[in-house]
Amino acid sequence: LRNEELYEPVCRFQSASSLTDEAARSRAQHDLKLIGMNKVGSIAADFIYTLPSGMQKRMRDICTPYTLLLFYNPDCHGCAETLATMKTSAVLNSPHIMKQVKILAFYPDEDREVWTKHQNEIPDGWINSYDKELTVLTEECYDLKAMPALYLLDKDKKVLLKDATVKEIEDYLKNKSL
């Protein structure tokens, strides 16, 4: 379930209910922790990303009015569909939007060979990166139970949209008249 507004009260009930078994209560408490991270309106968790060259940078150092985080796995069918939609999006690919929004495609998993094999699928204007230290997954900085995951951040790295669809991001950017 990807609608946190609906899921959060369910988790709160399960974690407090004496009718819930220990495994379900533990799962609900863990999910509550994930729901609480990177909420809309909060500052997004910073992380280090590694470029194909091996150079490492911090997400918070991206200096554009908007940052679009794409957490993905190149072998994931849903990720491939989202990537294709983004690459053909008239909104995301308009020259004016491209000046305002930096897209960070971030592979958080450990199989670097998979990421390397698919590098050419990421457009040149995007930041193509991976998590060399696997920090995002091991520290659970982001809720990545399901991928792809898209986050739209403002210039201060405040979360504007969390786990959004491409259409929601397009609509947001269009409504901001970028």
Where in this protein do the model-derived segments appear?
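Short active-site neighborhood of thiol/selenol oxidoreductases, capturing the structured segment around
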Residues: 57-86, 102-104
